[in-house]
A protein has these predicted regions:
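Conserved ABC ATPase "signature" region
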Residues: 78, 130-148, 257
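Conserved ABC transporter NBD signature motif
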Residues: 66-78
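Short catalytic/signature loops enriched in Gly
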Residues: 6, 240-319
Length: 319
């Protein structure tokens, strides 16, 4: 893979946490790529490591880190080699921004939303508050927030409007990439659809790339160019969206898609039996083996990553 042709190239990224029970392998040898003006959707069950992946990319690390290593190339530069000051000046909120989970509830209730959105621009773009507020109004226009809302407080806005404000805050420094962690959770269906339309418009108008972290398959499919399936801290399948949604390859991916209710069928959605493994002291074999209907002896060994019809799948079935 030529890292110069990719906006983001992640190679063997690892983030393990130290706990009393042992090391939690939240992100373990993760690999994937993201091109310019593209969107990758990271799908998986709760607790599989999706949010930890976003923290690993942005180096937002807790104190109990046991292992943090790998390569993260942003526009051809391995930013894992940056010092913390270099990372803050060139990557976090500059090259890559984050809309965290429940972002609409993270706004300061006693500060006007315009001032909150302006703050990253003042800090990272080294501009005046007046210039920053002018930029905020432009970002509000892109995300569908009335410009006069710069003087309002968060409690005066609906949940959907606060989510748009959080998105404007991520956009205000003009990053090439925005990571969105469950951006439509806790929103009603109509508001979810509106937020996804905003993201598609931003992608088209500004050329912004996205990593969309979610467990909502139906909603995320509207934005996805690529799909990455995460299970127990690992990426088990990556594929173009046009190939993945009609024909997923990994058994977990197949069962995940079969669990989505469909309107024009009498078939009941599938339930994935069993529980995901604990991320502490994981075995060396396939991490989905205990729940997999296709399990055989080889699954006790670490599965290879196999290239199949343009997709990459971590499974012995395709070796």
């Amino acid at each position: 893979m030529n890292t110069q042709t990719q906006l983001l190239h992640i190679e063997n990224l690892k983030l393990h946490f130290r706990t009393q029970k042992g090391a939690v392998q939240a992100v373990d040898e993760v690999n994937f790529d993201l091109g310019v003006h593209r969107a990758v959707v990271v799908l998986g069950e709760s607790g599989c490591g999706k949010t930890s992946l976003s923290k690993a990319i942005l180096r937002l690390l807790p104190r109990n880190v046991e292992a943090y290593e790998g390569k993260v190339f942003l526009q051809g530069v391995d930013v894992m080699n940056y010092s913390e000051d270099e990372f803050r000046q060139n990557v976090r909120w500059v090259g890559i921004s984050l809309v965290p989970q429940a972002a609409m509830n993270s706004l300061n209730p006693v500060i006007r939303v315009g001032d909150q959105v302006a703050e990253p621009a003042i800090i990272h773009l080294n501009i005046s508050k007046m210039e920053a507020l002018s930029l905020v109004r432009k970002m509000f226009q892109h995300v569908g927030v009335p410009q006069d809302f710069v003087d309002r407080y968060p409690f005066e806005l609906s949940g959907g409007m606060r989510q748009r404000v959080a998105l404007a805050m991520a956009l205000v420094t003009s990053p090439n990439l925005i990571i969105l962690d469950e951006p439509t959770s806790a929103l009603d269906l109509l508001t979810q659809a509106n937020i996804m339309n905003v993201l598609k418009r931003i992608k088209h108008e500004l050329g912004t790339s996205f990593i969309l972290i979610t467990h909502d398959i139906a909603t995320s499919s509207e934005l996805a160019d690529e799909v990455a399936i995460m299970y127990a801290g690992q990426i088990v399948e990556t594929a173009h969206a046009r190939d993945f949604f009609p024909a997923p390859l990994h058994p977990y991916s197949q069962m995940l898609m079969a669990s989505v209710p469909r309107l024009h069928t009498d078939e009941d959605p599938m339930f994935i039996t069993g529980q995901p493994p604990s991320l502490v002291n994981l075995s060396k074999g396939c991490r989905f083996a205990e729940r997999c209907p296709f399990r055989f002896d080889k699954c006790n060994e670490e599965p290879p990553v196999v290239l199949k019809n343009g997709s990459k799948v971590k499974c012995w079935l395709y070796d």
